């Protein structure tokens, strides 16, 4: 088997985890207590879902997941929620005091105390796997636990499981809406530390998702539940190929092979379509061409950047539902001809397609309409550098005055770590710039030398 272990860190990671596992259970016909009614064997005995669930002797399906937070309130909601019986109590790990939005607390002082317990639990999950293929790590960049503890955990996972893939789903601090003043510090410190340990990182920007909820789903004031259910759909699309038999089965390593041209350039942009409310869907049926087109609308992206300013290096289209290759090829051909999509000149083909015949499932009482087909596009574009530039600028404004730095130094960090992290991100921006250059101008060798 090709199992994946999901690790949900901090408030954002745990709440996205709730949305994802709720959706996985619905997709696979698993009840909140982990039982799978025998009459509901989906698709006549397709056991691909075992990549995400392990089965106990009593016939209960348990998620291969760990929920970690340095303070208990958010995980307590899982412990008392609808899905409390789904998880083994030891999978839900909490500390006593939180990281207080401070990377240094998550990475050094508070995180250190809990990391061995977490690794021990992950080891137990890994031992149940016959062929572990990697880890999916869910966290935010802005929080103290999400940034600090995640980077600590990634470093330790690299030591213990060197060859296994590690994919991140990270919540990027929204340009306008902020939950903490020190988000830019935490984001840059965590990006610097995890850059060499992460194989592929899908970023999600709260503000972009707010806008999608407001515009496409007509929700006036979206709550985190609305946002997380949408993120859950996206994560589900990305992992569907691991959990169902598809025509073109994509596994974790295959993502990287096709999306990551250089080790550091591993931040694909995620776009999902159709995001549509039930009232609207009632009146329209979306064709493959329409949803494919929608993927190239900046409005449907999960991070606010403008791909028209960048160049594409690779594109992965993951379709699910009633989709045939003929329609997909036609849709992509049309896009190639009429769209203003620029590919870098050293990567001419650039489209990889995966199809899963399982149509998207929706959460009952949720906001999304039930649709026949959906697509999730993962594209590696140089435009994502805009997101880094934005963050770096905010970092610079604060760091020039050394604002808030004493909180980090007080927890045992050195000021040098800030400048080191900042330099690494400057290098990352430069890497993106070089990758986007045509092979003709300058020395095309720049990107290969790290």
UniProtKB/Swiss-Prot annotation:
Q: Top enzyme class of this protein?
A: hydrolase
Q: How is it modified after translation?
A: Undergoes a tyrosination/detyrosination cycle, the cyclic removal and re-addition of a C-terminal tyrosine residue by the enzymes tubulin tyrosine carboxypeptidase (TTCP) and tubulin tyrosine ligase (TTL), respectively.
Quote the Pfam families the UniProt record gives.
Tubulin, Tubulin_C
Provide the GO MF annotations for this entry. Answer: GTP binding; hydrolase activity; metal ion binding; myosin binding; structural constituent of cytoskeleton
Binding residues for GTP: 11, 71, 140, 144-145, 179, 206, 228
Q: What is its EC number?
A: 3.6.5.-
Q: Which residues form the active site?
A: 254
Which residue positions does UniProt flag as site: Involved in polymerization?
450
Q: Which cofactor does it need?
A: Mg(2+)
> Residues that bind Mg(2+), according to the entry?
71
Q: Which residues carry this modification: N6-acetyllysine?
A: 40
Q: Where in the cell is it found?
A: Cytoplasm, Cytoskeleton
Query: Domain of life here?
Result: Eukaryota
Give start-end of the signal peptide.
Answer: none
Instruction: Tell me the subunit arrangement.
Output: Dimer of alpha and beta chains. A typical microtubule is a hollow water-filled tube with an outer diameter of 25 nm and an inner diameter of 15 nM. Alpha-beta heterodimers associate head-to-tail to form protofilaments running lengthwise along the microtubule wall with the beta-tubulin subunit facing the microtubule plus end conferring a structural polarity. Microtubules usually have 13 protofilaments but different protofilament numbers can be found in some organisms and specialized cells.
Q: Function of this protein?
A: Tubulin is the major constituent of microtubules, a cylinder consisting of laterally associated linear protofilaments composed of alpha- and beta-tubulin heterodimers. Microtubules grow by the addition of GTP-tubulin dimers to the microtubule end, where a stabilizing cap forms. Below the cap, tubulin dimers are in GDP-bound state, owing to GTPase activity of alpha-tubulin.
Its recorded name reads: Tubulin alpha-3 chain
This protein's species is Drosophila melanogaster (Fruit fly)
């Amino acid at each position: 088997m090709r199992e994946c272990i999901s690790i949900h860190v901090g408030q954002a990671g745990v709440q996205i985890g709730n949305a994802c596992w709720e959706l996985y259970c619905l997709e696979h016909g698993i009840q909140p207590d982990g039982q799978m009614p025998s009459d509901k064997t989906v698709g006549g005995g397709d056991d691909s879902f075992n990549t995400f669930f392990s089965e106990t002797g009593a016939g209960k399906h348990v998620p291969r997941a760990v929920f970690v937070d340095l303070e208990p309130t958010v995980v307590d909601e899982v412990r008392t929620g609808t899905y409390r019986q789904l998880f083994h109590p030891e999978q839900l790990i909490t500390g006593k005091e939180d990281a207080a939005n401070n990377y240094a607390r998550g990475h050094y002082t508070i995180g250190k105390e809990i990391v061995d317990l977490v690794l021990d639990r992950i080891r137990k999950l890994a031992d149940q796997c016959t062929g572990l293929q990697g880890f999916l790590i869910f966290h935010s960049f802005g929080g103290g636990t999400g940034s600090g503890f995640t980077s600590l955990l990634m470093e330790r996972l690299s030591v213990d499981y060197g060859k296994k893939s590690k994919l991140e789903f990270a919540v990027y601090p929204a340009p306008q809406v902020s939950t903490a003043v020190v988000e830019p510090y935490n984001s840059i410190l965590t990006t610097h530390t995890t850059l060499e340990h992460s194989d592929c990182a899908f970023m999600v920007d709260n503000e972009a998702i707010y806008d999608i909820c407001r515009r496409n789903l007509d929700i006036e004031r979206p709550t985190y539940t609305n946002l997380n259910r949408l993120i859950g759909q996206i994560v589900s699309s990305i992992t569907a190929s691991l959990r169902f038999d598809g025509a073109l089965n994509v596994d974790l390593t295959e993502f990287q092979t096709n999306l990551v041209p250089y080790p550091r350039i591993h931040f694909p942009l995620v776009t999902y379509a159709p995001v549509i409310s039930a009232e609207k869907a009632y009146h329209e049926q979306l064709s493959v061409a329409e949803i494919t087109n929608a993927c190239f609308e900046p409005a449907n992206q999960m991070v606010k950047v403008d791909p028209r300013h960048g160049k594409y290096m690779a594109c992965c289209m993951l379709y699910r539902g009633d989709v045939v290759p003929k329609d997909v090829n036609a849709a992509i051909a049309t896009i190639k001809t009429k769209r203003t999509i620029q590919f870098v000149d050293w990567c001419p083909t650039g489209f990889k397609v995966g199809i899963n015949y399982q149509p998207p499932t929706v959460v009952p009482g949720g906001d999304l309409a039930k649709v026949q087909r959906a697509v999730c596009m993962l594209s590696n574009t140089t435009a994502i550098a805009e997101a880094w530039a934005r963050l770096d600028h905010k970092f610079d404004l604060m760091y020039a005055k050394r604002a808030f730095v004493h909180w980090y130094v007080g927890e045992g960090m050195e000021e040098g770590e800030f400048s080191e992290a900042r330099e690494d991100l400057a290098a990352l921006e430069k890497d993106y710039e070089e990758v986007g250059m045509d092979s003709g101008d300058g020395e095309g060798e720049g990107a290969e030398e790290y």
